[in-house]
From Swiss-Prot:
Family statement drawn from the similarity comment of this UniProt entry: Belongs to the RecA family.
Cross-referenced SUPFAM superfamilies: P-loop containing nucleoside triphosphate hydrolases, RecA protein, C-terminal domain
UniProt gene name: recA
Name under which the protein is recorded: Protein RecA
Function: Can catalyze the hydrolysis of ATP in the presence of single-stranded DNA, the ATP-dependent uptake of single-stranded DNA by duplex DNA, and the ATP-dependent hybridization of homologous single-stranded DNAs. It interacts with LexA causing its activation and leading to its autocatalytic cleavage.
One MF annotation (Gene Ontology) recorded for this entry: ATP binding
């Protein structure tokens, strides 16, 4: 290789040859590691996979395939009371509305049937298991998935999947890496079965802080590294800002959901949703935000208008106006869905969070 021409080092100099070489390499990578292992970051780079809606139009759009991918593992993690279980139950409600069968493995023994019903979950048809230990939970999950009759299975949560040896041992016993090994072994088996049956598996996870981290994000998730690797989608869900208020009363929170990993569409998309206490995610607020981003609803300063009609000053009044007119809501929803089908995507990618995007 000469110093004057650094491209002599085995690199095709012609742009067409370089493009052909890249395409060949990408084809080889996909053959070796599966479709979705490498892709261009452009919005059109999506895999043709079936999905279950989350109930949020903007989150479905951010996920790139219309919701939680079927036949794959999705991890939903974040701090406490951020909306992780609410999001998982919302997915279950959408799957049931489409005629699907769902299961909820309640390792935390904390599922509230009344709250689940308020989110639209048909609790009479929901399969629920409250296992005694981590091995039992994952074995039940495997049997359900192998049946081929389950559309969505949720595990709440990974942190509560306590290994049998830890439960049977003495308080204070040191059992390093036991839960991580349990997760690694289970996920190796589950990945192939999920792909064959088309079941969407959702693992809810908690975050912990790594001791002694001076720089960067000190947060990490429980259960070792296996889930990070096997998950096709990882969603970071957390509260942001001040509580949403109606008068002087707090009625909800703003929740930020970020796709920190996505093997079925370009990752790093971020959306903000309104989580109302006792009611779940505000789908109308989400619709108004998305319609405004697409210029279907016009926004001039604090005023919102649709067509020639001014519908309110401020987002709350615009939402209240549309809520009183179901036919107007459906018209706006139809226009947003049509725009999505045409390929319009107002949700931009944002930088990743290094510590949790492994």
């Amino acid at each position: 290789m000469s110093k004057d021409n650094p491209k002599d080092f085995g690199t095709p100099s012609d742009s067409k040859e370089r493009l052909k070489a890249i395409e060949t390499a990408m084809t080889q990578i996909e053959k070796a590691f599966g479709k979705g292992s490498i892709m261009r970051l452009g919005a059109e780079s999506k895999l043709d996979v079936q999905a279950v809606s989350t109930g949020s139009l903007s989150l479905d759009l951010a996920l790139g395939v219309g919701g939680i991918p079927r036949g794959r593992i999705t991890e939903i993690y974040g701090p406490e009371s951020g909306g992780k279980t609410t999001l998982a139950l919302s997915v279950i409600a959408q799957a049931q509305r489409a005629g699907g069968t769902c299961a909820f493995i309640d390792a935390e023994h904390a599922l509230d049937p009344v709250y689940a019903r308020s989110l639209g979950v048909n609790t009479d048809e929901l399969l629920v298991s409250q296992p005694d230990n981590g091995e039992q939970a994952l074995e039940i999950m495997e049997l359900l998935v192998r049946s081929g009759a389950i559309d969505v299975v949720v595990v709440d949560s990974v942190a509560a999947l306590t290994p049998r040896a830890e439960i049977e041992g003495e308080m204070g016993d040191s059992l390093p890496g036991l839960q991580a090994r349990l997760m690694s072994q289970a996920l190796r088996k589950l990945t192939a079965i999920l792909s064959k049956t088309g079941t969407a598996a959702i693992f809810i996870n908690q975050v912990r802080e790594k001791i002694g981290v001076m720089y960067g994000n000190p947060e990490t998730t429980t259960g070792g590294r296996a889930l990070k690797f096997y998950a096709s989608v990882r969603l970071d869900v957390r509260k942001i800002g001040q509580p949403v208020k109606l008068g002087n009363d707090a009625v909800g929170n703003t929740v930020k959901v970020k796709t920190v990993k996505n093997k079925v569409a370009p990752p790093f998309k971020e959306v903000e949703l309104t989580l109302l206490y006792g009611k779940g995610f505000d789908q109308l607020s989400d619709l108004v935000t998305l319609a405004a981003d697409m210029d279907i609803i016009k926004k001039a300063g604090s005023f919102y208008s649709y067509g020639e009609e001014r519908i309110g000053q401020g987002k709350e009044k615009a939402i209240a106006y549309i809520a009183e007119r179901p036919e107007l809501e459906q018209e706006i929803r139809d226009r947003v869905l049509a725009a999505i089908k045409e390929g319009r995507d107002p949700i931009a990618a944002v930088p990743e969070t290094p510590a949790l995007a492994e």
